[in-house]
């Protein structure tokens, strides 16, 4: 025999579980012998009818499924929980005793039947279904019923059969006279009174307990709705919080992207400004370069006009009066000295390119001087006191020609006019010098080509400068328009979210374009978006910003 702690139906019942105790007592699952339980168990059908009547507050004759489940929860008839507990107890008993394991197998079937009896599948239950489920739950668990005497069976039978209630009948005349008959009549009257009292007590207890159960079911439903509503509200709040966090993360990513693109646009504007400054510096150098090109072209034309004109040397004839005098070409030489000096003074003003050309000519002249010195050192050459008339070429405008002519005059100034060998050698040497001077035209042509190439490069750079200036002026105008529109929108109190959305849309429309063209396209798209803003269309006469234009750091002055 298990103890009362192991069997929940053998513990004394609380007042809130009189129905459970009455059902357990009726089906042999004793929860403690108490007078009120015995009284309630005598009219179990009426007890269940009172409970159903109080639960059916609408009077429709049907009990909702939620109310039946709440009643089971109040009574502690949780089939799943009890099944799990009793399964654990059965498993422990089966491990200790094989016979008890066989009994536990049968108990598992009984518990399954009890759990199925409490399962209220229909949405609403009639009294017959309500009675069948509660009684079926306990009848499936019913054990051996307690022995009852004939008097108890008679009382229960009388109570069940007495419908409606019948009060005491008027006393009949006693058949037996005497004191014994009076005593029997008195006892019967007391028994009838006791039966009526028991019936009244049972009805009152059943009605009050049914009312108490109905109130407990309502309280259970109200309390069960609160956690569900709170859980639903908490779940909804958590969903809103998650959505807000996701929106905040998207906004943060958008802000980071806007900052990055703004920084890229700022860097592009800085590069454009730096390029504009470079182009302005180049533009300031253009007039100087043009003057230099014009000067070089003038010098080149002078070289072309004077270079191929080489005068042939005059034939020297021996004159008596001229042996110790001045040479006949002295006047010509003196006349050529003045323009050569003027040209020499002009050539000193040229740049490093002219200096390189002069150094090459001086090197050639130095080599000629070395040849003249070797020619003078030949043995057996007669020395004369006369001078040989020389003709200085007028086409050479550099200092090397003067030095070469002076060297030749110093070498052959004292030669005798009668010696034709010296004259022929001098003419041959002068002719060779003329040919060498003609060969100097090749570096001059190269210099001319180089100057033409440089002039073409300068022209192309100038054209690029002009094109870049026009493009930057357009970019400046677009920037000024965008900044003015932004200032107007700021005066109209536009929201930062709407302004950021327009900027992101303008940036997203040109994702693949980079560089200056992409910046201009983005500015154009942003300008169109700002012009089409509803706030500006609703307020076309909104005042623009009164700030001066030179305070804007994005303005470009070309």
From Swiss-Prot:
Transmembrane segments: none annotated. Residues 161-170 have a biased composition (Basic residues). Keywords: Coiled coil. PROSITE patterns: EF_HAND_2 (PS50222). Residues 161-183, 304-395 are annotated as: Disordered. Residues 179-304, 453-495 form a coiled coil. InterPro entries: CCD48 (IPR031601), EF_hand_dom (IPR002048). Residues 43-78 form the EF-hand domain. GO terms for molecular function: calcium ion binding. This is EF-hand and coiled-coil domain-containing protein 1. The lineage of its organism: Eukaryota, Metazoa, Chordata, Craniata, Vertebrata.
